Regions:
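Walker A/P-loop NTP-binding motif
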Residues: 361-376, 396-399, 510-511
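Pre-ATPase regulatory/linker segments immediately N-terminal to the P-loop/RecA-like helicase/translocase core
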Residues: 6-74, 79-88, 92, 151, ...
Length: 847
């Protein structure tokens, strides 16, 4: 393969950009960016020569644009490669992953995502997660089932015994049931690797009356033993076919989110300018580019993605008249608004780091409205991984737009968009199927379901609005509808960015950001819950890290020892307006290096100071010692603790019946129950309903992320067992930071003291006199708890315990919040036992 150089500078630039001729060399320069080398590097001039090109021809920009548009429009199924399928049985060992993959082999050594390897590495990690998810669906395959009619177009099948709980795997309104007649099975048997049977088959598209036709329906409901599904009118085969024979039933995911992520990575591979933006150069390297100390041998110019970007001047603060005047007194919030409105750095995404209760949503809402006021031509996309995050921002925007006189006058004077088309909340069809009862009327009015009927909005409709709010997956659908072809949006706001994997965040960027004047703003907190990853292997290799987290660890975004950082790239919110100062102090010292400042009004957070059951009125945190037993339901990964559930309900009854003292009543809506396991949540819900408190909200830690309640009562469930996923410091951080006025933790201290963070919490509660347990002659506690001489038993067990590092449930937390999944951590994932069951099941079905 010969080396060919083009003479034209323009042609050289295109060849370099598309074929990534400098990727690896440039990244090598960036890797030496440590303190000992920076001065030396600044004085050097790097001469970079082009790599060999197969045919020596530059990539035509018109053809490249056509290829990008084709990528956006199409959404292939992205079946797993043969190499990845072969690596699955051995759980993706290093050897399997690095065979014929030099890029990933290097990544395993460095554990660094770079400009040149991000697409290849992320595709590998995403495939591991994809296959791990498909494994669970493969276990639900039913070789011979009868279909039972339950209503018009609605049917069900009864599941035979499986090693997984269908409720833990199958998603109603999103997943599908494929009914395969025996005639179709004979003509086209299932593949030996049953994971491939989860992909669409050609026989699904035959004529209805074809005996080999496979019938596809949408899952309606799922329980441990049954799956209910519904056909559309266009593909209903009729009762005579469905109830007259047995079927092989395949329960599968459409894999739509995975397919959007695969496509985003493909688009990123084709877009060096966007990759340059997502991997910003450190300051010393940018200076070298400015000073032309990086040169191309025999070439006329640097590629555009290496060229220096113009600096942007800040808009004077007096030019911004805030809609929410409270932001004037919050230096960090005001800084974020001014910086984004002025135009954040074009070197990389702008980050609003918002710890719990610091007003992140308030800041983002104000910024979006100021952009629409001061930059009428701006068009804004607001997106997040969850519907709840999208709804929160969209509702606050709608409230301002509908009630603020200044906004209404301003929008009335604009020709485009029209006053009634300032914002559109785009719901997915699946959300419409689930029901819109919980969606506020104002938000519903400004959505594609305004008449309680789902309306599929085309791109031409979206282009009529100033602000579009949609989940990341819905943005992926809009990209398929050619939204990217219009280069429409000037700003992309990704909320809860710390809770999305990097490929997930890319769904909201790729196909949308195609020019340097489209700004990306990431808001969130990477120290709270991240993305849910089913594969421990994928998580440990880096899939669990968010784009936001990676950027904050890079040189450009780092905070130095004196607390200084580049304010053109980020704002760090500090002032907590949610919780009692002692509650803030608890999670502030554990997770935020004491950077947060408690500023909630006393009247809002001192509600429990006169409560009879609070031993210390100045410290509204109780640790209720409970020595229950952790149990697990059959065929389920979820745990429950009967005694802790009873204790939770006892506290609820006392709070509602007795109030908080001095006439302060407590409603059911004031209390939030956090049950980290689904089984515990179901048990607590049942007990609360039986005692007449059905409106007390019970949810997981994930349910409460981004939310708050005056009173939070949490059951930690794990007792005389390993900590399970409660070992995660991010999970504990969310748990501690939801309560405004009162936090009650119910758990087993003997188990929890082996966890660094819970050990600290228990110690603090003991010091403050709020560590409580039942013993004779003491203050009233749940009468069903056994009498325990807690101090003596705890001291004895402590002195006789094993060394902490040898204890299975001990968690040594690093100073950095990010924790790589340990083999001992029992998350909802494919465990060793489950993997064996999968192998056996697949072997039996393929015989």
């Amino acid at each position: 393969m010969g080396s060919t150089l083009t003479k034209s500078s323009k042609e050289t630039m295109h060849a370099i950009e598309n074929l990534e001729l400098l990727d690896h060399q440039l990244s090598r320069i960036a890797l030496i960016a440590n303190a000992d080398h920076r001065l030396t590097q600044k004085k050097q001039t790097f001469i970079l020569g082009p790599k060999a090109i197969d045919d020596g021809k530059p990539d035509d920009p018109v053809e490249k644009q056509k290829r990008l548009w084709a990528l956006m429009r199409n959404l292939p199924h992205y079946p797993p490669s043969a190499e990845m399928l072969q690596a699955l049985p051995t759980e993706f060992t290093d050897k399997d992953l690095t065979t014929q993959n030099a890029v990933f082999a290097e990544y395993l050594t460095t554990k660094r995502l770079e400009f040149y390897n991000v697409c290849s590495v992320m595709q590998t990690l995403l495939t591991i997660e994809d296959l791990s998810t498909m494994q669970l669906y493969a276990l639900l395959l039913q070789p011979d089932v009868a279909v039972q009619r339950v209503g018009k177009l609605s049917y069900k099948i009864v599941l035979k015994t499986t090693s997984v709980n269908a409720e833990d795997v199958v998603a109603p309104n999103l997943d599908e049931v494929v009914l395969v007649p025996k005639s179709s099975l004979i003509a086209s048997p299932l593949p030996k690797n049953l994971l491939m049977a989860l992909l669409p088959h050609a026989n699904e598209f035959l004529e209805k009356n074809d005996p080999q036709r496979r019938y596809v329906a949408n899952v309606d409901q799922v329980s441990r033993t049954t799956v209910h599904f519904r056909f559309g009118r266009h593909n209903w085969p009729g009762d005579d076919i469905l109830q007259g024979q047995g079927f092989c039933a395949i329960i599968r995911s459409r894999r739509t989110p995975f397919r959007y992520m695969y496509r985003a990575l493909k688009l990123l591979q084709e877009s060096p300018l966007v990759r340059r933006y997502l991997f910003p150069f450190p300051g010393w390297l940018t200076q070298m580019v400015d000073q032309s100390k990086i040169q191309l041998r025999d070439c006329g110019t640097l590629p555009s993605w290496m060229q220096a970007k113009p600096k942007i001047e800040t808009v004077p603060s007096q030019a911004i008249l805030l809609l929410n005047p409270t932001i004037y007194s919050n230096t960090e919030q005001f800084q974020a608004v001014k910086r984004i409105v002025a135009g954040p750095s074009t070197e990389g995404p702008y980050i609003v780091f918002g710890p719990p209760g610091t007003g992140k949503t308030t800041t983002i809402v104000e910024t979006i409205l100021q952009l629409r006021l001061l930059q009428p031509r701006s068009r804004i996309l607001v997106t997040a991984g969850s519907n709840s995050a999208c709804d929160t921002i969209a509702l606050k925007l709608c409230e301002y737009i509908s009630s603020n006189e200044r906004l209404r006058k301003h929008f009335a004077q604009q020709e485009q968009p029209k006053p009634d088309r300032q914002l559109i909340r785009v719901f997915s069809r699946s959300i419409h199927h689930k029901g819109l009862k919980t969606v506020p009327p104002l938000l519903l009015k400004n959505s594609n379901c305004s008449k309680h009927i789902y309306e599929h909005l085309g791109v031409s409709h979206i282009l009529q609005y100033g602000i579009t709010v949609a989940t990341l997956c819905t943005v992926g659908r809009l990209v398929s509808d050619d939204l990217g072809k219009h280069k429409f949006f000037s700003h992309i706001f990704i909320d809860e960015a710390g809770a999305a994997t990097e490929p997930e965040a890319l769904i909201g960027i790729m196909g949308i950001k195609q020019t340097s004047d489209c700004h990306v703003i990431l808001s969130g907190d990477h120290k709270q819950l991240g993305a849910v990853i089913k594969s421990n292997r994928a998580a440990s290799l880096g899939l669990s890290h968010s784009l936001m987290e990676r950027l904050l660890r890079s040189d450009c975004y780092k905070v130095d020892a004196n607390g200084n950082f580049d304010r053109s790239l980020q704002t760090r919110l500090r002032r907590n307006y949610r919780s009692h100062p002692e509650i803030v102090r608890l999670f502030n010292e554990l997770y935020y290096n004491g950077e947060l400042i408690a500023q909630a009004p006393d009247a809002d957070v001192n509600l429990a100071e006169n409560w009879a059951l609070l031993p210390n009125p100045r410290f509204p945190i109780i640790f209720q010692a409970t020595h229950g037993v952790t149990k697990r339901e059959q065929h389920s990964t979820s745990s429950f603790n009967q005694l802790e559930a009873q204790v939770l309900c006892w506290y609820v009854k006392r709070l509602i019946n007795d109030g908080l003292g001095h006439g302060k009543r407590v409603s059911q809506e004031d209390i939030g129950i956090v049950a980290p396991y689904t089984a515990q949540g179901k048990l607590v819900t049942k007990l609360l309903q039986s005692q007449g408190h059905p409106n007390v909200e019970v949810g997981s830690v994930e349910t409460y992320q981004g939310r708050e309640k005056p009173i939070i009562i949490a059951s930690l469930v794990r007792s005389f067992a390993n900590m399970g996923f409660m070992r995660s410091p991010r999970r504990v951080n969310v748990l501690l930071s939801r309560a405004k006025s009162l936090l009650i933790l119910v758990g087993n201290p003997v188990t929890l003291r082996h966890h660094r963070d819970f050990k600290s919490i228990i110690r603090e509660c003991k010091n403050q006199g709020t560590y409580v347990f039942k013993k004779k002659g003491a203050q009233q506690r749940p009468e069903f708890l056994p009498d325990v001489y807690e101090e003596q038993s705890d001291e004895e067990s402590s002195s006789e315990s094993e060394d902490e590092e040898d204890t299975p449930w001990f968690a040594r937390m690093p100073q950095d919040i990010s924790v790589t999944t340990d083999k001992m951590e029992k998350r909802f994932s494919v465990s060793e036992e489950l993997t064996k069951a999968i192998r056996n099941h697949l072997c039996q079905l393929s015989i």
